[in-house]
Amino acid sequence: MTNLRKTHPLMKIINHSFIDLPAPSNISAWWNFGSLLGVCLIIQILTGFFLAMHYTSDMLTAFSSVAHICQDVNYGWLVRNLHANGASMFFMCLFLHVGWGIYYGSYLYKETWNIGVILLLTEMATAFVGYVLPWGQMAFWGATVITNLLSAIPYIGTTLAEWIWSGFAVDKATLTQFFTLHFILSFIVMALAIVHLLFLHETGSNNPSGINPDSDKIPFHPYYTIKDTLGLLFLFLTLLLLALFSPDSLGDPDNFSPANPLNTPPHIKPEWYFLFAYAILRSIPNKLGGVLALLASILVLLIIPFLHTANQRSMMFRPISQTLFWILTANLITLTWIGGQPVEQPFIIIGQVASMSYFLLILVLMPLAGLFENYMLKPKW
């Protein structure tokens, strides 16, 4: 009798993707983050679904509807805390996933990488519109400042900003539009994630050594399903610790006040996972230049595959590139810290140096390091 999972049209797809999938035998825990992101996405969609049942996208009642969810809905506080902190866990896994891709040279699977960058941009848009929905003070002003940046685009900027606002300022129509976008973008993210997975399974997975693993592969189940389960346990533990013991530690205190268009907070900032890009935006004194730098900070990932100069794929055996990679990591942490600080010295100059270093490392120093490592590995006789 033939096995159902190998003959049934639907089960066959699942089988080839998660059970009998040939995987390199030496992939490390860094390869867990793909599955962790999938689980994070499912958690976000499920908790968001239950929140949407009780949320009202109206200027007058949005803030109180979130308070109602936390106070009156059965386990509403838990659902809301899981959704808010789940976003932080999602982006933490996302940044580690991108970092691992750069370190091990996974960007050389160009189609998978490019879809991944589009996915990252879509997720950032989803998180941004979602952040505005509780209609807290910082959420409102964050939405006003960030969407107002569109007006810097020549000719069409003002029209574009008013189209995003559905009026002449952030208002009731903006909130309704953002709620709709937040809802629909979640499913677009899910569709893009499936495309990302399809492209990955066309080429097969990379491995830490960066060499072709075709001669040494093992089935995904049970080896990597067990390995991924360990990562999932850590994810659930961290998320539950955050949601149950310190649910507001990653949020902004200003969001405990309802949005007030007549009172500007002394320091406007987005959520922590956007602070690195926000710091780059603020480091350019010119408005249009700042917007372009903000876009470039993410879109620069698209050209990384074309800047690969090393003969070896992975950084595992390339100490100079490794050093530059960890400098880049420290640089991003610095930018995240600077994004949360007020616009005054010495934070302005630190932000400008860190922003310049970010682009210099990716566009110049890392490709040069690859060429130098090639030269060092050449036989000298």
UniProtKB/Swiss-Prot annotation:
Membrane topology reported for the UniProt record: Multi-pass membrane protein
Pfam families assigned to the protein according to its UniProt record, in alphabetical order: Cytochrom_B_C, Cytochrome_B
S-S bonds: none
Protein task: Component of the ubiquinol-cytochrome c reductase complex (complex III or cytochrome b-c1 complex) that is part of the mitochondrial respiratory chain. The b-c1 complex mediates electron transfer from ubiquinol to cytochrome c. Contributes to the generation of a proton gradient across the mitochondrial membrane that is then used for ATP synthesis.
Note: Heme 1 (or BL or b562) is low-potential and absorbs at about 562 nm, and heme 2 (or BH or b566) is high-potential and absorbs at about 566 nm.
Protein's UniProt name: Cytochrome b
Annotated PANTHER family: CYTOCHROME B
Annotated GO MF terms: metal ion binding; ubiquinol-cytochrome-c reductase activity
Record note on cofactor: Binds 2 heme b groups non-covalently.
Entry similarity comment: Belongs to the cytochrome b family.
Encoding gene (name): MT-CYB
Chain positions recorded as heme b b562 binding sites: 83, 182
Protein residues bound to heme b b566: 97, 196
Names of required cofactors: heme b
Organism listed in the record: Antechinus swainsonii
Domain of life from the UniProt record: Eukaryota
Compartments reported by the entry: Mitochondrion inner membrane
Subunit structure: The cytochrome bc1 complex contains 11 subunits: 3 respiratory subunits (MT-CYB, CYC1 and UQCRFS1), 2 core proteins (UQCRC1 and UQCRC2) and 6 low-molecular weight proteins (UQCRH/QCR6, UQCRB/QCR7, UQCRQ/QCR8, UQCR10/QCR9, UQCR11/QCR10 and a cleavage product of UQCRFS1). This cytochrome bc1 complex then forms a dimer.
Main location (coarse class): mitochondrion
Cellular component aspect of the GO annotation: mitochondrial inner membrane; respiratory chain complex III
Chain sites annotated for binding a ubiquinone: 201
GO biological process, one term: mitochondrial electron transport, ubiquinol to cytochrome c
